[in-house]
Amino acid sequence: MASQGTKRSYEQMETDGERQNATEIRASVGKMIDGIGRFYIQMCTELKLSDYEGRLIQNSLTIERMVLSAFDERRNRYLEEHPSAGKDPKKTGGPIYKRVDGKWMRELVLYDKEEIRRIWRQANNGDDATRGLTHMMIWHSNLNDTTYQRTRALVRTGMDPRMCSLMQGSTLPRRSGAAGAAVKGIGTMVMELIRMIKRGINDRNFWRGENGRKTRSAYERMCNILKGKFQTAAQRAMMDQVRESRNPGNAEIEDLIFSARSALILRGSVAHKSCLPACVYGPAVSSGYDFEKEGYSLVGIDPFKLLQNSQVYSLIRPNENPAHKSQLVWMACHSAAFEDLRLLSFIRGTKVCPRGKLSTRGVQIASNENMDNMESSTLELRSRYWAIRTRSGGNTNQQRASAGQISVQPTFSVQRNLPFEKSTVMAAFTGNTEGRTSDMRAEIIRMMEGAKPEEVSFRGRGVFELSDEKATNPIVPSFDMSNEGSYFFGDNAEDYDN
């Protein structure tokens, strides 16, 4: 990439750092993890949770959500100004699950946001520690990506549900900063831009006045983030067109959808980080592990090692399969919702199934669900091998892919060819190459036509034994090509919107 000099590594985004060396980055990320861990320990004490209850992923999600809500300044301001019945803008809470007389009970807790902020800051040496908050947002986003298929959101913005491999990070809040922007997929950025343009079409004043100036600069910033994710000159030139438009409208929406479709073959670079639930960091810190001193990376072996030695439990509904629940959470932990299942099966050491074949609903339990028959079980989050996370789209390639999802977005930097259904993707590009972007469109289509099935991505990269911490002996996996590669294959996963 030509602009490599100006790109910051994610750890730098993660640490607001000016150029740091690897050791400083590892210490800095470790410090963030320490803070989350200390906060979690303190919250478990406040809530009087037993060790087992503290390792329950549902409790972890509630505690994470409470602190994210306590620091959501815009929403807090909004709630103060628009009071709604029965909602105290100064309080936050959620369901906490406890084991009472051999049964799981739900208890709704409520805390002052101020108190939660105090506990968080105290755990983070008095800082607001926004990076730790963003880290938890990305974990929630990865869990959503693995649990739900954003069919409706795609259709609403005029995209095709089969483009779901482009939707990483589609539920990340706007306030998730540079680290959040790095993990957003092409489709997510396109969707945000289309929503913005549609508002501009419907609301005369959207681009006008003092507010309009802010809106415009946000629009251009988002265009630039998206441009930075594309890896070909023609796709980037198209983004310049969209960004420079005097009055963004339907022509821009067309161009954006075109560029999103093209990303199924000419993939963009999207960062992947293994963000784990707070209930993994807490026990590690309380056992005396010093993340800052030891150093930690979100893209190397560290999360794998941590999960090898962690006990995490989950509530299981009566007709759910605990192994399937484990797969869901394992994929979320490694930000692997859109990775090739054959590679995931190889790394995990057990078969990873498409979403539609899993007998499990989401991890969260709704407030109206009956607790009487709830069991709990251990989540199996260990792996057979580990691999380095990638932020490139890999080169392009085509292969028999599935009806539901017609491309993948690689998570791991491991040699393989990347499946996508070329004929299906190309069928979307009939005809429309006129207009201002015609030469770019023609160029993009030409590159897509040229994508060859035998091309291998991440050549020479492999997975590593868990004992191989320095990544010295790459093992290049061999795949059974008859297997299905896509997770959301012909799928019936619940949609996130419900």
From Swiss-Prot:
It comes from Influenza A virus (strain A/Memphis/5/1980 H3N2). Residues 8-21 have a biased composition (Basic and acidic residues). This is Nucleoprotein. One of its GO terms (cellular component) is viral nucleocapsid. Homomultimerizes to form the nucleocapsid. May bind host exportin-1/XPO1. Binds to viral genomic RNA. Protein-RNA contacts are mediated by a combination of electrostatic interactions between positively charged residues and the phosphate backbone and planar interactions between aromatic side chains and bases. Encapsidates the negative strand viral RNA, protecting it from nucleases. The encapsidated genomic RNA is termed the ribonucleoprotein (RNP) and serves as template for transcription and replication. The RNP needs to be localized in the host nucleus to start an infectious cycle, but is too large to diffuse through the nuclear pore complex. NP comprises at least 2 nuclear localization signals that are responsible for the active RNP import into the nucleus through cellular importin alpha/beta pathway. It is found in: Virion; Host nucleus. Belongs to the influenza viruses nucleoprotein family. One of its GO terms (molecular function) is structural molecule activity. The keyword RNA-binding applies.
